[in-house]
Amino acid sequence: MNDTVREPTGGLGVNHGPALSVVLAGGGTAGHVEPAMAVADALSVLEPNVRITALGTARGLETRLVPARGYHLELITPVPLPRKPSGDLARLPPRVWRAVRETRAVLDLVDADVVIGFGGYVALPAYLAARGIPGLRRRIPVVIHEANARAGLANRVGLRTADRVLSAVPDSGLRGAEVVGVPVRAAITALDRMALRAEARAHFGFADDARVLLVFGGSQGAVSLNKAVSAAAAELAASGVSVLHAHGPKNVLELLAPRTPGQDDPPYVAVPYLDRMDLAYAAADLVICRSGAMTVAEVSAVGLPAIYVPLPIGNGEQRLNALPVVNAGGGMVVADADLTPALVAREVTGLLTDPPRLAAMTAAAAQVGHRDAAAQVAQAALDIARLAPSRRRAVGGRR
């Protein structure tokens, strides 16, 4: 195996007691790591003695996010995957099988009872390693969660031998999947925006009765969102709209001011990133954002109406992610190429100055949002693990 990141003192270490051992395969991007961490937290609540191991690679966000959350991380060789299948599994590059061998070693090390996979290049080796070898290696049960509207290659492969399959939305391409939503951290799902609103607006310097637009494009920001919204700053201010804009740590935001701002103009608060998304969500009335699965899940879980601007890459997954909320009336989709300053000023002003319409969108977004997905995925995995033949044989001794 590659280098190993050990848990903080007092964390959940590796041992071989009677507690259930769960391996989470969700490394790489935030869209894979964050749902895995939400499920880890839910597992710890449902089964306080559970032993949790996250599987990841040295190049993924998990090297920072997993230890920060207090969980144990094991690293394997990264295996970037194509978006579409390209031949039989036997023809996959040798590094895949190296990653599978490393993953088998991890599963043995932690005496895994169940693997929960979230797709991506960490999940595929985990699914293959969990299959076992008749007469040589025991099979380990697998639970799959698909966050995107269109399932990726890893989860489509894992589907063949998975014991339970769950998804964020219907028709993800995974046959027999149970729709539960996207696992979201408890700090977001438990958020009461109205109760926190006064504190949140004071934190960012907004008036209690402000009309607040929140803009963010993910952890690195989004250049097209930055340009369109910042160029509309004067028009938004003239309409009484305050803005909280997370532009990304690598980006510079230029506010164009064709008119002289007055002392009573609503503030335009620009920050590189937001480390308190709960306060940002509580302060906002409307959001402009991308439509990655995790973003849509969080925004709808807290009941915020949104203008979703799908990232114009891939197979159109981001647009599909937003459609359930949009079709329910909780948001709208604007193509990246159509996001102009004029459109921003027109749509944002129109929504924030029409309380009945905004209230209807808010209610629709909240209705679509899932707040218990993490607990449902965690419970499914615990149920599968307890029923596994290898677990039953192990009662009173090692497997």
From Swiss-Prot:
Keywords: Cell cycle, Cell division, Cell inner membrane, Cell membrane, Cell shape, Cell wall biogenesis/degradation, Glycosyltransferase, Membrane, Peptidoglycan synthesis, Transferase. It holds the Pfam family Glyco_tran_28_C. The keyword Cell cycle applies. Gene3D superfamilies: Glycogen Phosphorylase B (3.40.50.2000). It is a peripheral membrane protein. Its main location: membrane. One of its GO terms (molecular function) is UDP-N-acetyl-D-glucosamine:N-acetylmuramoyl-L-alanyl-D-glutamyl-meso-2,6-diaminopimelyl-D-alanyl-D-alanine-diphosphoundecaprenol 4-beta-N-acetylglucosaminlytransferase activity. It is found in: Cell inner membrane. It comes from the Bacteria. One of its GO terms (biological process) is cell division. Its EC number is 2.4.1.227. It catalyses: di-trans,octa-cis-undecaprenyl diphospho-N-acetyl-alpha-D-muramoyl-L-alanyl-D-glutamyl-meso-2,6-diaminopimeloyl-D-alanyl-D-alanine + UDP-N-acetyl-alpha-D-glucosamine = di-trans,octa-cis-undecaprenyl diphospho-[N-acetyl-alpha-D-glucosaminyl-(1->4)]-N-acetyl-alpha-D-muramoyl-L-alanyl-D-glutamyl-meso-2,6-diaminopimeloyl-D-alanyl-D-alanine + UDP + H(+). One of its GO terms (cellular component) is plasma membrane. Pathway: Cell wall biogenesis; peptidoglycan biosynthesis. UDP-N-acetyl-alpha-D-glucosamine binds at residues 29-31, 148, 185, 219, 318. Belongs to the glycosyltransferase 28 family. MurG subfamily. HAMAP family: MurG. Cell wall formation. Catalyzes the transfer of a GlcNAc subunit on undecaprenyl-pyrophosphoryl-MurNAc-pentapeptide (lipid intermediate I) to form undecaprenyl-pyrophosphoryl-MurNAc-(pentapeptide)GlcNAc (lipid intermediate II). This is UDP-N-acetylglucosamine--N-acetylmuramyl-(pentapeptide) pyrophosphoryl-undecaprenol N-acetylglucosamine transferase.
